[in-house]
Curated annotation (Swiss-Prot):
Residues 148-170, 178-209 have a biased composition (Basic residues). PROSITE patterns: H15 (PS51504). GO terms for biological process: chromosome condensation; negative regulation of DNA recombination; nucleosome assembly. It holds the Pfam family Linker_histone. Residues 39-113 form the H15 domain. Keywords: Chromosome, DNA-binding, Nucleus. It comes from Glyptotendipes barbipes (Midge). Belongs to the histone H1/H5 family. One of its GO terms (cellular component) is nucleus. Residues 115-133, 211-221 have a biased composition (Basic and acidic residues). This is Histone H1-III. The keyword Nucleus applies.
Amino acid sequence: MSDPAPEVASAVPVASPAKAKKEKKPKTDKPKKAKAPRTHPPVSEMVVNAIKTLKERGGSSLQAIKKFLAAQYKVDVDKLAPFIKKYLRGAVTKGELLQTKGKGASGSFKLPAAAKKEKVAKTPKKAAGEKKPQAAAKPKKALEKKKSIAKKPKAATATKVKKPVAKSTKKPAAVKPAAKKAAPKPKAAPKPKAATKPKKEVKPKKVAAKKPAEKKPEAAKKPAAKKA
């Protein structure tokens, strides 16, 4: 008889305790590196300051801006180059900068009429100061309008008063005949005065005395004819 084959024990991998410990270690246990404080202002501020100080008519190029940043802020321009280009593109699209030459981040850049912005900032103050007198002037105009409105009714009343005056002038013209009718009454009153005047005049009496004197001699002549 053949001997039975020996049983082979199956090898089962068992995790070592050392590996388990490594996996359980939290990552937060590592100390974080403290961020170094910035020794320069933001890229946008530096670029705007560079363009302002350079004051180039045709605009400042990217190379000129980099040179200014390296000299003024002592910054590693090669590391900041992508940030500078990104800001230039965004500023052009937003209208914060004008690109006089080139396309994208290459070319020359200029501020959009900084002097005009200052003037515009000053003019709103003046406008605000001017609006106050205008607001004060509006009530004056309103008062003038009210006065004119008040004057118009006065003129209307004056015209209304004038019309009745014209009518009253016409009425006296119609009353004149009534005055003429009343005139004969005073004429009748002076008649007694005229009667007194003939009493004072002696002339009519003298004429009456002469006529009978002439008749008397005629009567004397007639009896003389009878005697013959």
